[in-house]
Every structure is written in C-alpha cells, then in structure tokens.
Amino acid sequence: MSCRFFTTAVQTKTGISMLLIERGEGMETKTIKTSYSSSAGTCLIILEDVKVPVGNLLGAEGQGFLVIMYNFNHERWYICAAVISATRKVLEECYKWTNQRTVFGKKLIEQPVIRAKLAHMTSQLEGVYNWLENITYQMTQMDYKTQSVKLAGPIALLKLMSTRVAHLVSDEACQIFGGRAITKTGMGRYIEAMQRTYKFAAILGGSEEIMADLGIRMASKGFPEARL
C-alpha cells in the first residue's frame, strides 16, 4: 500500500467530517487480499493518536456526509462505464469464439441456441451502453449541484442494470465457452476473469438493492401528487 494521503470520514463533535490525512506517525496499513488483484490497494488502515492539521478538513466540519454524497454520482458513473466496457470485451470474445469453435462439424455460431444467447446478451448490453451515453451527455450540460438532484436516481438505476447485464453476459459467456471459461490462460482468460470479478461493480458504490431503492425514491420524490 503506497498511498501518501487518505480521505477519511471521521467522527467529530459536530458529526461526521472528512479529513485529508497524510501518512505519518501513528498510521499503519495492512494489505487485504481480494479476488481481483492488489492493484486496487485494498487495505486495513489503523490510526492511533494521529494529529491532523485544521487545514486538512475537507468541506465544513460535521458536513462530511455531504462531501461523500457529492462524489457518489461520479463514482457510480465511473463504475458503470468500467463494467460496461469489461462486459463488451467479454461479448466480443464470445463472438470470436463462436465463429472459430467447431462442434459436430459446424461452427458454434451456426447453432440456433448460441445465436439466441448472443442476441439476448447483445441487446441487453447495447441498452445499458446507450443509457450510459445519454446520462454522460446530461452530465456535461449540468453543474455538479444540479447533477446531484436530477441524475442521482437515473445513475443509480443505470448502475443496477449495468451490473445485472454484466451478470447475464458473464454467465452466458461461461456456457458458450464451456470448460475454457474456467481457465486462466488462452481464449477463456477474459471469461474466467469476468466470472471472478464482476461482482465488484455490483457492490462498490452501493449494492444493487440500494441502487434500486434510491432510484425509485428519487423518482417518487419528484413525482406530482396524484389527482383523481
């Protein structure tokens, strides 16, 4: 773990505050192994009698939760972009494999059941990809405060659908590749990696259940009162 600075939510007298803590005396980090890799730098941070300068306060004291919330939209958008990109790579590998692999004297792509799988995978992926493009454009037309109000719900629902589609594509790719899908080398390596890591996106930045609830709560919040 090589980070020098850590943005940390801490309990202060007036509530949760965000501090920028520099590595130094009283701080210890221990690596936590994950199913992905060590590149994320996941670790346990131990703070003991650490002194932080007043100037390292991010935002107002006691308003740390707002700082966290303001960053959520962009974080979730990034997760959507990343998981959709990874899913597209897996689908691309499926197209390559089905046009190359021969079974019972025919290429896999000539089997109706395989084409049906690819059709379902492709249509689902293109749907969330275009939704991402739409939201990305809207983000460029709004300031950060407006985004937090107008796009929090749509981004949450996009994240929910993006990870659901990743689950579908990953699972179907495993069926298409067969035994190669559980090997870490050769043409199956991308499929194996996706099987092992796609749940990261479904958890980080808020789980699928929380995204679903947030999306509907935000939609209901702006919905006019019913009139009979």
Predicted regions and their residues:
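Long, acidic (Asp/Glu-rich), low-complexity accessory segments flanking structured domains
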Residues: 49-67
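A generic hydrophobic-helix recognition signal that picks specific residues
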Residues: 15, 33, 42, 171, ...
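Short, surface-exposed loop/turn microsegments at beta-strand edges and helix-strand junctions
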Residues: 26, 36-38, 61-63, 187-194
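Alpha-helical interface subdomain recognition
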Residues: 46, 70-228
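A general structural signal for short secondary-structure junctions and capping/turn motifs
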Residues: 11, 35-38, 203
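A short core secondary-structure module
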Residues: 1-28
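Exposed loop/turn and edge beta-strand positions of beta-sandwich/beta-sheet ligand-binding modules
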Residues: 4, 41, 156
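Flexible, small-/acidic-enriched active-site or ligand-binding loops
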Residues: 22-53
